[in-house]
Amino acid sequence: FGYCISDDPNASPSGPYYDASAYCVLDNDFSPSQFGTSQTPQEFRDVTAAHEFFHAIQFHYDWFEDLWLMEGTAMVMEDQYADDVNDNVNYLGNSALTSPGTPVDRGSGGFEYGAWIFWRFLIEDRNELADPLIIKQIWERAAGASIDTDGLGPDTVVRNEYSLEAARRVVAA
């Protein structure tokens, strides 16, 4: 389908900042012979572009973030952009909904993609369907980079929480 990656020579998991520039690559035709017919090539293109573009946005915050946050929020952006495609429902089998006792922040076994339903719940619970601000707020709290969201200056680190703690604090606010 596609991928998003950084070629930023300064991006490093051991550096003081975890933000990185990014570029995305998408398949050139989403041919049914390659991807099947569960969606049209245009639908595959739409959800893949939304998903990968959101990864590029995530890289601005922290490209080494937990997979459940990265993939789950990218999946929910597919739903935001192309709600009628419903490709993301294919991942509900690997979610806390269908596997009681599995942590919502599990980052393996496909559960990182199935976490989208948790993010969708938060968006709907906040009545933010048109503008899912809660997702941005959680990314800002979890960011490894200094992001000036409080007017304290770009060199003031006020975030850098683990993803689950960032989500908990934003929801509790």
Task: Walk through the language-model features, giving the residues of each.
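Juxtacatalytic substrate-recognition/specificity segment
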Residues: 1-66, 73, 84-87, 98-101
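Stable alpha-helical elements in mature extracytoplasmic
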Residues: 41, 45, 49-53, 69-73, ...
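Generic, well-ordered alpha-helical scaffold segments in large soluble proteins
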Residues: 56, 122-125
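Secretory-pathway/luminal and periplasmic proteins that interact with or process carbohydrate-rich
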Residues: 81-86, 144-150
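Structural helix-adjacent loops and short alpha-helical linkers that scaffold large soluble proteins
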Residues: 82-88, 125-135
